[in-house]
């Protein structure tokens, strides 16, 4: 639900590089090169099948772990390197829905980050500094509540010992500029 979701668009060069590596630029990036991600409570995500096809890459030494289906190179989600903080960012392009259903399920995009947005477009694209603070005000209480309840240990991409269920591959590359 929109109350438990944080919907953002990231325009960083690493998200763009990831789309290129998966050969999914057309489906992963919007017209400005942004990747839409919705951040959710890790324990609310369940992988029903295909765990044996999961692959993981990371583009920087301490950066996000980027999970995808190795069989079709479909992006699934981003996590931190280790479980603990309750963070999973699901890539919106991996879900089959209509725009109406997406808006109902996730609410509006709360903020667009890591891009250069012309001042005239910042309000429309939700790329103002106040949008960042608003997003943090919405998400931070949930994040810390989930953390206090230990929900960061229930991330489906890690086993009970906290090890990734697929060995992360370090891809040495540069961000898209």
How would you name each of these model-derived features?
Residues 1-177:
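A short Gly-Trp-Pro
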């Amino acid at each position: 639900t929109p109350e438990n979701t944080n919907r953002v668009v990231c325009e960083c060069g690493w998200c763009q590089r990831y789309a290129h590596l998966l050969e999914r630029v057309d489906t992963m990036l919007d017209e400005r090169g942004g990747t839409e991600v919705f951040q959710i409570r890790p324990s609310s995500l369940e992988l029903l099948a295909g765990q044996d096809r999961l692959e993981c890459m990371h583009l920087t030494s301490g950066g996000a772990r980027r999970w995808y289906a190795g069989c079709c190179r479909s992006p699934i989600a981003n996590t931190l390197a280790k479980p603990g903080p309750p963070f999973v960012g699901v890539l919106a392009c991996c879900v089959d829905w209509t725009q109406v259903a997406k808006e109902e399920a996730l609410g509006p995009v709360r903020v667009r980050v890591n891009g250069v947005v012309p001042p005239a477009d910042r309000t429309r694209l939700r790329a103002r500094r106040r949008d960042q603070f608003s997003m943090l005000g919405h998400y931070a209480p949930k994040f810390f509540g989930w953390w206090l309840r230990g929900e960061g240990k229930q991330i489906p991409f890690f086993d009970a010992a906290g090890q990734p269920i697929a060995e992360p591959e370090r891809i040495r590359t540069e961000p898209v500029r």
